[in-house]
A protein has these predicted regions:
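Anionic, Ser/Thr-rich low-complexity intrinsically disordered regions
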Residues: 1-74
C-alpha cells in the first residue's frame, strides 16, 4: 500500500501469505475429498509455502534492524 514502511509491508506480506497458504491447503483437501487430481494444487502449495518462508525471513531481518517486535501492529 502507498505510504507503508518496509516493516509494515513485510508484516502485510507475512499476514497475507499465511492466508494464501491456508486457503491452498483447503483447496488441496477439497480436491482430494472430491476425488480430483491434486498434483498441480500441491505444487502451488509448495511454492506458496516457500514464498511464505522468504516473507518470514525478510520480516525477521527487518525486525533485527529496527529492534521492533515482528508481528505487532505498530
Amino acid at each position: 500500500m502507498v505510504g507503508e514502511t518496509q516493516l509494515q509491508l513485510a508484516r502485510r506480506h507475512v499476514r497475507e501469505g499465511r492466508a494464501r497458504v491456508a486457503r491452498q491447503q483447503e483447496i488441496v483437501a477439497e480436491l482430494r475429498e472430491g476425488g480430483y487430481p491434486t498434483e498441480i494444487a500441491k505444487t502451488l502449495l509448495v511454492t506458496l509455502e516457500a514464498t511464505q518462508r522468504l516473507h518470514e525471513e525478510h520480516l525477521i531481518r527487518i525486525v533485527g534492524v529496527s529492534g521492533r517486535p515482528a508481528l505487532s501492529q505498530s
